[in-house]
Amino acid sequence: MAKEWGYADHNGPDHWHELYPIAKGDNQSPIELHTKDIKHDPSLKPWSASYDPGSAKTILNNGKTCRVVFDDTYDRSMLRGGPLTAPYRLRQFHLHWGSSDDHGSEHSVDGVKYAAELHLVHWNSKYNSFGSALKQPDGVAVIGIFLKIGHEKGEFQLLLDALDKIKTKGKEAPFTNFDPSCLFPACRDYWTYHGSFTTPPCEECIVWLLLKEPVTVSHEQMAKLRGLYSSVENEPPVHLVRNWRPPQPIKGRIVKASFK
């Protein structure tokens, strides 16, 4: 059996290209953002998300992250505007985090790493299926939100309370009536660039919208996330931490800012 990718030394990001060659491609994510090199693009429009809370379906521990899955069979929960030329359907969101509060985000800003990074994954519905969208350079749009330590975020607690039902790898539970826009920061300013999924197969099909303003969560809330296990039930427990990919070479790509 082919070895499964992961985040350990033997199957971690340095090895992903052995099974998924595109992981060494020219448009890989995440990247380090250096704000002095980023230009404001006045043509970038504001973005808007209109999410139907009824489209939230389940929450899942896949051993790599916790993921909330949405019904994307029709245009229910949509992302529009910004750098996008078409509406995109919300498919899922998930998080990346570290073993302590001082790191865990995948993107960094002027050397600053945050405690976690939330990714909301949308696909361009003109391509008819998520699988088809993965083959297009503008097939997927991901909103990235940084989580920093500070005051507790009440809206985030709804998600954390569901984690007790999915402690171990392979567990899934109903998670309904949730509008993830409650997790957005007040400020909608963003950076945008063309990149990839940060997990294998690392397809280069993503228009990234990285929000400038982080949201705050408490130390206790982050600890709850780290209480998940990457091991299955009745196996020796292994904590699910350090599920982030290090920065990839920017290779001449341009990052643009929606703000001055």
Predicted regions mapped to residue ranges:
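Alpha-carbonic anhydrase
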Residues: 1-260
